[in-house]
Structure formats: structure tokens, C-alpha cells
Amino acid sequence: MQHPAKYSNVFLPIFADLLKDCGNVLDPMAGTGKIAKIKEFGYSGKVVCNDIESEWKNGEEYAVDEWHNSDAANMDWANDCEFDSICTSPTYGNRMADNFVSKDGTRRITYRHYLGHELQEGNTGYMQFGKKYCDKHKEIYSECLRVLKPNGLMIVNVSNHIRAGVEIPVVEFHKNVLTELGAKFEREIKVKTPRMGYGANSKQRVDTESILIFKK
């Protein structure tokens, strides 16, 4: 089973370098578990993955050390302050969150279409950027900070997108909400990545994604 929004390969060596001193890392919204490919770039710690949709992990074979299936806002399997680091890529609140079923044969790059059925309640993959999306990510980040050790490292890969010709400030939201929850923002790395070449805004794409780096 394919996932419509796996990590771009260009991020993996960057993550591996940032995480090199961490004994373990959690990806709470792991999708297929591709984060485990940081081991190919020198990371030697334990990789723990969690996702609300259990089927994603069946689509690829990555060297994940431990899998969990739960809402990232309620990871009751994890202890307080259990993880040295968290590295994740939340949904971007873009048109990949469209939740209708296409019957006209056109290509649809959405979580719903790739998974093949309705998403689990609480999955941000059906949330367009707005109040529901923002409230849910605040809950998720509160839970992430609960399971992250004091002075632990938090890495968030996220991007703005274009809607009706306007750039939506998704990156700024994630930066602000984590700061409001008590995380210390350290720096942002902007990385040019290939973007989708079709769709309503195919001629207007944000050309970079951001890696936001925080300490608890």
C-alpha cells in the first residue's frame, strides 16, 4: 500500500545528523515508518513508530524497532519522559485532506484514496487547515511533549501550501503552537523539494519545506 506523503529522501541524512546523539526517537505520525531509513545514514539508536492507521505499516518494509497503533494525541502505551527525541511530519492541511471518493477516473492524491477507505476518527489526514486542524495538532503536540524527556529534541517537518492563490502559513502555526506549549524553538532549516506537478495549484507551489527544531 502506497502512502501519498512519505518523507522526501533529502531529509533523511539531515534527520540522522540532528538525531545522532539520541538513544531513541519516536515518530508519532509515522505513516509507513520511513523514518527508520535514518539508520542508513548512521543513526544507531532505537526507532519507535506510531500511527493511527494500522495499514500504512504494511506498505513498506523499514527497519522499525517498535510499532504502535494509536491516535498521536493519546499514546497511552508511552511513559512520561520516555523519549530522547521526536521526529515527525504532520499533515499539511492541504488538498491531500479531501475526503470524497472520485468516480470519474481522475488521479487523486489524497490520504483517503491511497488508504482505500474512510480514515480513523482523529486522523488529521482529513482535516483542511483551519480550527479543527489547529486544535487537533495542539492536542498531539501536548502529548508529544509529555513523552519527551526534559531537554529532549523535537523535529517537525512541515510546509506551507497554496490555496486559491494565497500561501497558507502552516509552518508558522506549528512553530507558534509548540512554543506556546513550552517548547523552545531553536532554528529552522528550509529545504527545496520536488513538488506535485498537477492539480488546481500546479503552477503555484511553495518550493521549500521546513525542518523546525525545538528543545523541550
Predicted regions span which residues?
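Class I S-adenosyl-L-methionine-dependent methyltransferase catalytic core
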Residues: 1-216
